[in-house]
Amino acid sequence: MAQRLLLRRFLTSVISRKPPQGVWASLTSTSLQTPPYNAGGLTGTPSPARTFHTTRVCSTTFNVQDGPDFQDRVVNSETPVVVDFHAQWCGPCKILGPRLEKMVAKQHGKVVMAKVDIDDHTDLAIEYEVSAVPTVLAIKNGDVVDKFVGIKDEDQLEAFLKKLIG
């Protein structure tokens, strides 16, 4: 009840305020004015036309939603897939994840990255024998072709990706 009263007083004081006076009043009133414009286009200057560019963003990283999604987007993928098994509470995962995403993005679509949270998808973690995080799998044509556990530097990640793409 007291919160409603306070909110009501605040809103009425904000709404009932007078416009600013003095130097700032002249600045705000002139800067907010629009030039006169005749619908016939003979007087005044219309604002320039706005252009919007709509290009499709190609994402190289995605979060796995469930088992069928993993099957469809990872196992059945024609493109090689790097699968990052991670957890929200895992410190090393927070370091490796962005590093790995950056390295995958540099491959320009030759490889994609799937992120699997082991707390949300324990069935996938068990199926792929993930015993520690971060665990990264390289999957090509539905088969695991390489794997590592822990943090790697960028040179090691690049070699890992080249081996997968190769």
From Swiss-Prot:
Cross-referenced CDD domains: TRX_family (cd02947)
PANTHER family assigned: THIOREDOXIN, MITOCHONDRIAL (PTHR43601:SF3)
| Modification sites for N6-acetyllysine | K152
Compartments where found: Mitochondrion
Residues annotated as site: Contributes to redox potential value = G91, P92
> Which positions carry N6-succinyllysine?
K152
Q: What is this protein called?
A: Thioredoxin, mitochondrial
Q: Where is this site: Deprotonates C-terminal active site Cys?
A: D84
PROSITE patterns for this protein: THIOREDOXIN_1 (PS00194), THIOREDOXIN_2 (PS51352)
What job does this protein perform?
Important for the control of mitochondrial reactive oxygen species homeostasis, apoptosis regulation and cell viability. Is involved in various redox reactions including the reduction of protein disulfide bonds, through the reversible oxidation of its active center dithiol to a disulfide.
List the source organism.
Answer: Rattus norvegicus
